[in-house]
Amino acid sequence: MIKLAAFDVDGTLRDREYMPESARRAVARLKARGIVPVLCTGRSEYEIRPLREELGIDWAVTCNGSHIGFCGRTESGNAFAEETIREWRQIAERRGHTLLLYGSENMYITRQADPYFQQAQREIGFMEPLPLNPEEEAPAIYQCIIFCGEEEEREYTGKNRQKFYIHRWRTWAVDINPNGRNKAEGLRELLDRLEIRPEEAAAFGDGLNDLELIESVGTGIAMGNAGDELKEKARYVTRSLHDDGIEYAVDRWILPESR
């Protein structure tokens, strides 16, 4: 019996600002049947708040699993050590890189004029971050995007790469999370809190940062627009986002399992 359904956001529930009406209907049907919907995303709580409120979803696992929020309030967080962020800011300042830092209430950027950040804005769409001046201390940070190449990335992670969860999503941009946190780890913590077993959960995704997530639950579902690597690991492959993939999977594989 499925008791919880976790949804990646970009490429799964929505494509930029477009979200199919069928996805809204599917989430509403899950709630009507007592199944807990959860957003599970690499974005910050700050960024996904409008979507969470629009869909009436209480729980969100954000920052690729490093932050868990309930109705926008931090319930659990796994932040970077302050010294790590301090060192990375010094490296970025010296090398001319830009850091996008995810806090619980806001996002912060070290250089707003960075061309890579501006390209990411055009391609993906970030909510506007607050500028963080070199002399300002950063708050608790749950995820860091570094706009740099793969070789330059090693200046930040050094010999301690195993301490971080690293997801490179462009040749010039990489997500880094503390203590090996990923979406699966964050969802597992939430499942424990709600006393739901992994086999009683479903998860939807389309990207490589959803790989651990869909393998960690009883019903892992890859979107039709996902890559082959994710599809090979999924229990089911649904239709694409633009072809009502969420509703199709909910009606075919989740609601029948919740009876």
At which residue positions do the language-model features occur?
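Short, structured coil segments at secondary-structure junctions
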Residues: L55-G56, N64, K159-K163, S216-V217, ...
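Residue-level signal for inorganic ion chemistry
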Residues: L30, T41, C144, I214, ...
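Asp-based phosphoryl-transfer active-site loop
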Residues: I2-E17
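Active-site phosphate-binding/coordination module
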Residues: R16, E21-P115
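Asp-based, Mg2+/Mn2+-dependent phosphohydrolase catalytic module
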Residues: S216, I221-R259
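Active-site metal-binding loops of divalent metal-dependent hydrolases
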Residues: G11, R43, G205-G207
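Conserved acidic, metal-coordinating active-site core of Asp-based
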Residues: R95-F204, L208-S216, N225
